[in-house]
């Protein structure tokens, strides 16, 4: 039985839709408004299983003239965005009961604390784990944020208006004023071009990341710490220790150069400095507010000495800190255009920022003013511990081949051989010999190629940064110990005097299968073990492994790789941090965060968890303070629970079944994607893959190489394209054959046992179910009929049949008649969107036909409308790539 939307959510969706309709009617007139309404009503009737309106719907849309295309597309796109705003606000609204949330399995930290206490976790164990907890979100600029920042800001203001409307004490005139503000914002959004015509630069992307911190995370972090503090105090009589900071942030924006020639050493240098400038500016605002509040005269001896016996000691200390922050901000601004070294007043490490604040904090507590100490001052201390002087630590990512090419050039210039032809053992011996020695390797007047110079310039920029500004150096396609040793040597040769974690990234199926062996060989090297000081980070890639092998085989390979890495780390007495390169979509490792964490192999979390947050997911999870605070609840609660009460080991029979499923799935997936004649042509014809390149989504190219087939396409556009035509193929292809074969071979009972007894398999099946609920065979068929040549239609028939088979299998395993019965709110949310997404699909097909037709005279108008439909479908599906 379908569950309706919560009345308050339904009312907000109705209000926003009504205001949008009024705006469209006023500005475009009755004729176009009536056409839009006719399309909407026909789409809704079609979805409600009344007499099919689909033929009429297609005819109306195909009959639109070029000038009507964009307004119609924009109307449905805007409505879907407004629906998303209403849903996102509802998730965090004050009065929303847990049963009404989009995912009613969300746990707050209070619920998690109580569950852990009920399972016998002692206070000492609890606090010891909290003190050792490290949850780090790595913000990346992967090109999946399709909404312009200008519109995001308006959408945030619309959400604030919805919150204001929730007040129970509103007067009629106050209500009317808020509605008028909503009308104005929706009209502003309607008159704002939703299409980005120029790709953002890597620096633009970094600034967008800084804006998320300034507008949301800056408030959300101390708010969440207060929530944790209160929850601990209530349960244990002891709050969160002031030196415990379980949440941190890093970024790839301006640091990820893998396959992106637009991220240069100069860009990275600029981002480091902009980050320092932004941090100083934000702290200055906080310090100014604290100086206004901390007017007290009573202080302890420590503060009296530090302030020179000042009559207003707190203000005196804060004035000194303000002066140093001003100097830091001025230096960062000046250094953008020069190589000026920081003056003595410039703050260089986090301790210089935090210690003056702690002096004030200790004094207030010593003088009996705990209530003041634990006010805004504590919030600023928490921020300083989380964000530091750098605001957000930067990861550097580069392909291992780029480093090897530099070593090849160096060795050739020195006349010591062809580095690329050496065995792995020879490379290791050479690199360790150089690392143990003291003489420089790089010749002073070495005529390096432009490519080698860029790699070394990046290393020099990294070497110049304070340790607290750096997170990790991630190496793509790293399979041998020499890949890691090379980076350490190049950094040392560039002047690096401290250690930075080096994280090999394993992302293809074969890489994942060999990950533990590779790390084991690395940890077998005595020099390297001494260098890392007992800590090793490894990155697991979800996007490319799923694109390479299909979702099911990739998920099992990721699970097994983590298990094996945990054992290797334990053998060498090394603390392992697994860095999860997940995307927003299921095809790229996405899904509900807490359930994903709780389904990791036992021992793989152990208090440390790094995860990428990509593109549009940054906005959905962290774009507003209350939303960000809820995300912290989900992630931290799950990391704490997975660390203190790890899931059980899977049964041997379950492992055997997953081995079988994985083998069947990868073969089935690759048979279609790699070997099936006509598949690539079908993909490029049936989806808007080639047209996606016209969307200025991010600074990074869609392809690693200018030419090539599916293998050269990045995972994001691969997912994006299939999402647009509603086949969602990357997330389920291969799983259908694997599950069907297992059932046919008598494995249904084993699969059902796995579903109820193994969090990993349960989560995988639930994610499969969620993505299959978005598949629409009829819409996919329409794309095929209009865009694909007839001789390839049998392939489409097969794919749609297989998607239907996957749906039937999931329902059989879960003992249900239709998908999403255990997640009715998500089901209804999808069904609310469908009547608004359907016209965008049909319109997109019409536009693709026109755009691809030779002799199309109104190319610019058609392309603009096409881009709007892509944005609208992404909004309807709540993801892009």
UniProtKB/Swiss-Prot annotation:
Active-site residue list? 142, 547
Q: Which GO terms describe its cellular component?
A: cytosol
Q: List the disulfide bonds.
A: none
EC annotation? 4.1.1.31
Which residue stretches, if any, does this entry annotate as coiled coil?
A: none
Q: Name one GO molecular function term.
A: phosphoenolpyruvate carboxylase activity
- Name the InterPro entries on file: PEP_COase (IPR021135), PEP_COase_bac/pln-type (IPR022805), PEP_COase_Lys_AS (IPR018129), PEPCASE_His_AS (IPR033129), Pyrv/PenolPyrv_kinase-like_dom (IPR015813)
Q: Could you tell me the keywords of this UniProt record?
A: Carbon dioxide fixation, Lyase, Magnesium
Its function?
Forms oxaloacetate, a four-carbon dicarboxylic acid source for the tricarboxylic acid cycle.
- Put simply, this protein is called Phosphoenolpyruvate carboxylase
């Amino acid at each position: 039985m379908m569950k309706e939307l919560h009345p308050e959510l339904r009312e907000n969706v109705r209000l926003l839709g009504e205001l949008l309709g009024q705006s469209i009617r006023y500005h475009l007139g009755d004729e176009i408004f009536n056409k839009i309404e006719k399309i909407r009503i026909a789409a809704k009737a079609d979805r409600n299983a009344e007499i099919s309106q689909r033929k009429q719907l297609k005819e109306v849309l195909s009959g639109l003239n070029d000038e009507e295309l964009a307004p119609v597309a924009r109307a449905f796109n805007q409505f879907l965005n407004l629906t998303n705003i209403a849903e996102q606000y509802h998730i965090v609204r004050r009065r929303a009961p847990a049963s009404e949330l989009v995912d009613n399995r969300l746990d707050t930290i209070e619920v998690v604390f109580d569950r852990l206490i009920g399972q016998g976790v002692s206070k000492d164990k609890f606090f010891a784990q909290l003190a050792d907890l490290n949850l780090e979100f790595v913000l990346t600029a992967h090109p999946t944020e399709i909404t312009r920042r200008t519109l995001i800001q308006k959408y945030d203001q619309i959400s604030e208006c919805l919150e204001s409307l929730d007040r129970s004490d509103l007067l009629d005139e106050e209500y009317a004023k808020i509605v008028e503000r909503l009308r104005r914002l929706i009209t502003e959004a309607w008159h704002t071009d939703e299409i980005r015509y120029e790709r953002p630069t890597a620096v633009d992307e970094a600034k967008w990341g800084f804006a998320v911190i300034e507008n949301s995370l800056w408030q959300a972090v101390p708010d969440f710490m207060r929530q944790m503090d209160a929850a601990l105090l209530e349960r244990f009589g002891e709050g969160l220790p002031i030196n415990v900071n379980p949440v941190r942030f890093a970024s790839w924006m301006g640091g990820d150069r893998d396959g992106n020639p637009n991220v240069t050493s100069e860009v990275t240098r600029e981002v480091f400095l902009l980050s320092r400038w932004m941090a100083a500016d934000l702290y200055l605002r906080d310090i100014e507010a604290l100086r206004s509040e901390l007017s007290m005269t009573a202080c302890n001896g420590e503060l009296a000495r530090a302030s020179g016996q000042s009559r207003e000691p707190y203000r005196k200390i804060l004035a000194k800190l303000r002066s140093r922050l001003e100097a830091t901000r001025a230096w960062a601004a000046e250094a953008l255009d020069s190589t000026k070294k920081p003056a003595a007043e410039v703050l260089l490490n986090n301790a210089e920022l935090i210690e003056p604040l702690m002096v004030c904090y200790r004094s207030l507590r010593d003088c009996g003013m705990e209530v003041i100490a634990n006010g805004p001052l504590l919030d600023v201390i928490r921020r300083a511990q989380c964000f530091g002087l750098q605001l957000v630590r930067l990861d550097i990512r580069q392909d291992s081949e780029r480093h090897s090419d530099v070593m090849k050039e160096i060795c050739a210039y020195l006349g010591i051989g062809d580095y690329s032809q050496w065995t792995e053992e020879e490379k290791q011996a050479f690199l360790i010999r150089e690392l143990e020695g003291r003489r420089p390797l790089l010749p002073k007047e070495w005529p390096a190629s432009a490519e080698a110079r860029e790699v070394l310039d990046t290393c020099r920029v990294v070497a110049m940064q304070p340790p607290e500004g750096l997170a990790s150096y991630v190496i793509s396609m790293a399979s041998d110990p020499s890949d890691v040793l090379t980076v350490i040597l190049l950094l040392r040769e560039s002047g690096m005097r401290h250690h930075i974690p080096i994280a090999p990234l394993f992302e293809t199926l074969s890489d994942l299968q060999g990950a533990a062996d590779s790390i084991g060989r690395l940890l077998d090297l005595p020099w390297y073990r001494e260098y890392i000081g007992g800590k090793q980070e490894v990155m697991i890639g979800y996007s490319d492994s799923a694109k390479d092998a299909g979702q099911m085989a990739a998920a099992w390979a990721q699970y097994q790789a983590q298990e094996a890495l945990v054992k290797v780390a334990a053998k060498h007495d090394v603390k392992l941090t697994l860095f999860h390169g997940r995307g927003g979509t299921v095809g790229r490792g996405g899904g509900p965060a807490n359930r994903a964490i709780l389904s990791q192999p036992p021992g793989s979390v152990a208090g440390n968890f790094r995860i990428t947050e990509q593109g549009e997911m940054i906005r959905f999870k962290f774009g507003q303070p209350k939303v960000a605070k809820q995300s912290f609840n989900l992630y931290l609660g799950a990391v704490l629970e997975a660390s203190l009460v790890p899931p059980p080991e899977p049964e041997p029979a379950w492992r055997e079944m997953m081995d079988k499923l994985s083998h069947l799935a990868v073969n089935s997936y690759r048979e279609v994607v790699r070997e099936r004649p006509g598949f690539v042509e079908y993909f490029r014809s049936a989806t808007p893959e080639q047209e996606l390149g016209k969307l200025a989504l991010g600074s990074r190219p869609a392809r690693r190489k200018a030419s090539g087939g599916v293998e050269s396409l990045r995972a994001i556009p691969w997912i994006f394209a299939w999402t647009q035509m509603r086949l969602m193929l990357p997330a389920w292809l291969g799983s259908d054959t694997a599950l069907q074969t297992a059932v046919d071979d008598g494995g249904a009972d084993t699969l059902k046992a796995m579903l109820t007894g193994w969090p990993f398999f349960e989560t995988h099946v639930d994610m499969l179910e969620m993505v299959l609920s978005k598949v629409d065979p009829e819409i996919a068929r329409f794309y095929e009929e209009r865009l694909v040549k007839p001789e390839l239609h049998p392939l489409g028939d097969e794919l749609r049949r297989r998607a239907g088979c996957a749906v039937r299998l999931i329902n059989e395993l879960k003992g249900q008649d239709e998908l999403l019965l255990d997640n009715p709110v998500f089901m209804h949310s999808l069904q609310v969107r469908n009547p608004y997404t359907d016209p965008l699909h049909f319109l997109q097909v019409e536009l693709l036909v026109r755009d691809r037709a030779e002799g199309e005279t109104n190319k610019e108008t058609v392309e603009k409308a096409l881009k709007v439909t892509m944005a609208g479908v992404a909004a309807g599906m709540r993801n892009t790539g």
